[in-house]
Amino acid sequence: MTEHNHNHDVELDISNEEELLTLFDENGNEVLYRKMLEFYHPEFKKEYVILAEEGAQSDDDDMIELIPMINEPDESGDGGKLVPIETDEEWDMIEEVVNTNMEE
């Protein structure tokens, strides 16, 4: 079994500035999402965004579903496209970042 050695002392540039994004679901319907968190991780050399569907409500038993994505900038460095998370290591890192930052 391999051990994942994450550098927990890595300084992340984290933005909590909320922004609304319109994305399309698998049926081509527009869905409005709120960007909850955005950060660059130097170990993976990628920028990540954490989204939540706008208007989604949580109750005592259920939490709002957060959707992590990789933000790949275009050639000019602006905008870009959102792509799915690629590895288990990235999922583990994102879970740790989200848990740490959403508690604050």
Swiss-Prot record:
Pfam families documented for this protein: DUF1292
HAMAP family: UPF0473
Family: Belongs to the UPF0473 family.
Protein name: UPF0473 protein SH1304
Organism: Staphylococcus haemolyticus (strain JCSC1435)
